Amino acid sequence: MTKLIAPSEIVGGVPVFKPTYEQFEDFYAYCKAINKYGMKSGVVKVIPPKEWKDKLDLPYSAETLQKIKIKSPIQQHISGNKGLFMVQNVEKNKTYNIIQWKDLSKDYVPPEDPKARRNSRKGSVSKSTKLKLKNFESSFNIDDFEQFRTEYTIDLSDFQNTERLKFLEEYYWKTLNFTTPMYGADTPGSIFPEGLNVWNVAKLPNILDHMETKVPGVNDSYLYAGLWKASFSWHLEDQDLYSINYIHFGAPKQWYSIPQEDRFKFYKFMQEQFPEEAKNCPEFLRHKMFLASPKLLQENGIRCNEIVHHEGEFMITYPYGYHAGFNYGYNLAESVNFALEEWLPIGKKAGKCHCISDSVEIDVKKLAKSWRDNNKESKGTPPLNQLPNPAMPLLHRPTLKEMESSSLRSTSPDVGHFSNFKSKSSGVSSPLLSRMKDYSNIVEPTLEDPTLKLKRISSFQEQPLNKLLKRETSQTAMLTDHEDNIVAMSLTSMANSAASSPRLPLSRLNSSNELSNAQPLLDMTNNTLAFPRPNGPSGLNPLLYISNKNISGISHSAPHSPVNPNISLIKRVKSPNIVTLNISRESSRSPIALNYEARQQHSQQHSFSTPSTVSNLSTSVLGPLSDTNDIKTPHPERPNHKTANRILKKESPVETSKSNLILSKVASTRQEDSFTSRNDDLDKEQGSSPLNSKFAPEEIVLSGKNKIYICKECQRKFSSGHHLTRHKKSVHSGEKPHSCPKCGKRFKRRDHVLQHLNKKIPCISNETTVDAPIMNPTVQPQDGKAAINQQSTPLN
């Protein structure tokens, strides 16, 4: 039901609805139809139709009356005056049944109106007996409740007189702090017939039905046993929920409500009246301790609606609608919270009082998801499999034909996404899609430059799928232009955390390195290459780095995708839109020439393997990055051992042979001959041409078998080039204008100099610097395998 239903009348600013049974039988739809009015007035009254009342078990059976238990009622100690009161609720450690509660009500009788005629009185009011002192269980049997069926309610004729009610209301506010009312509040239970499914407070259809647990009073009903003056203070419902209250029998309730438009004004007023409580807790009104008379509120420009709630009627409270009230006498009501769809955004930002241990907190996001998943009529977001492809293009899987006709980009999915049809991608859980989206926002490489265009594998589509999975090759023409090479990065392997360390070096493609490939490639014309999809794990990188250098006379192997692509994150050269992006913990280091980075890649050894077969390592000519010849890598079947040897400067072929000797010790015995002979050829080709170094010749001094690195600026000595680099950036960098007066170390900010001087270990001045011993790198065999240990510390 989406049609708006207007109220039958408005009483004291409160809309009153009198629905037909057809309107009334759908609770959720009817509440949505009247929601507009309740969100303005704070509360509404709903008078149920006669057809619904006929379904109730009236008068209530003895069994129903017997199960009513009022546990630990509260005594309300009220202090204050002039319309402002504070309520302290003290629990009474006793349980009453309904027979005892009615007997107790004789001690809480509303006063007689002195203006009423004496002959209108029906006799003196009887006092309570000792019945209330008996044990609520052992002293009563089913026969007692059967007899009580005819007297469980009271004479309500006095409460039909509006003048009488007005007198009692005024009397209540004048004498509120004279007595201590008793209220049987928050007692779990329900006395609605179990077979009643229409407007049964114990089982109202609403969003809270999808909560995983039952919370008393929230999605599990409470019984409220009232007596004269028993009050409920100004408050909002827990988590700003809706609530519904139904009086089963007895005296009426007086309700007050603040229109939602005045809620901020009301809160500010109460904050001013109770400053200490408001200071200690911003949600102090949720404590249900503060009362302000409607007269006082109206005098301060705050509208206050009021209405009388009679037996057999419903009152509904709304989010942001502050409400309060009291009972005119003995009665029994039932109440519970509920929620409509309109409440979801309200509940997400609702305040919560942390002063009360049992305050309610609902996971609204989880509740909304559970409700939408289980509600077939929900207008929420459709499932992912129902979304059209344009809505989420990342979830669209192109066909092989589409892939062949599309442009190759660094953000393109790998071949495995097209050929492995057993895998499914998810827009929620796939790290590939999320990372592709993140990186595409950082770098947007393009291939529109004519020097970067590639020819596609013409026979790719003709290859059977099983050939791709078996790493079979084909003869294809990949590149024709003799241009500088392009380095592309596969975001697939980055999503699989394979490229999380971008400082690892990349072996070059199109190299004559037999050890870097596991399988020889068939002889091909024009020296062209094809890169098939390996059948290794998903972490393999399917997009390899392609060179457009034609090297004649060299037999190539089909390289397989390495597990870890060892390359800085993105590097593109010889292009109008050059992109250089390096995400690394070393990104703060001073700039280093690309030639040095390229050479550093050759001095480190890496091994890539798959669960079933050995992954191959492929290399490519680095073009303008370096003109250095290839340096062999160990066979990937062997365990990987990093060497501490760094080629800083090649003075002569003798030094190169020493370097090769160290590398040959790291390699396996089976590869030693091939590895050494290969590097001997390299020495012959290079002759004595020195390698460009990061350090100047005067910065490196050979002392026996050790190298000492000397700073040209301050002549300080270091045991490793790494420490010298850090020293130059720290001390002699122009970016740090403030220096230490003792040691000369430089800082970006003056306060950093003070922190440096106040260290527990004082710095040493340049004049008193003493050279510390330098640890030598030693080669120690461990379990028959070469292992190089190096300890280096700065001399300062």
UniProtKB/Swiss-Prot annotation:
The keyword Phosphoprotein is annotated on this UniProt entry: yes
Motif placement: Bipartite nuclear localization signal: 455-471
Domain JmjC: 193-355
Region ranges (Disordered): 599-692, 774-796
GO biological process: chromatin remodeling; negative regulation of autophagy; negative regulation of transcription by RNA polymerase II; positive regulation of transcription elongation by RNA polymerase II; regulation of gene expression
Modified residues (Phosphoserine): 430, 459, 557, 561, 575, 584, 652, 689
ZnF start-end (C2H2-type): 709-732, 738-763
GO molecular function: DNA-binding transcription repressor activity, RNA polymerase II-specific; histone H3K36 demethylase activity; histone H3K9 demethylase activity; sequence-specific DNA binding; zinc ion binding
Function description: Transcriptional repressor of photolyase PHR1. Recognizes and binds the sequence AG(4) in the upstream repressing sequence of PHR1. Derepresses PHR1 transcription when phosphorylated.
Protein name listed in UniProt: DNA damage-responsive transcriptional repressor RPH1
Gene that encodes the chain: RPH1
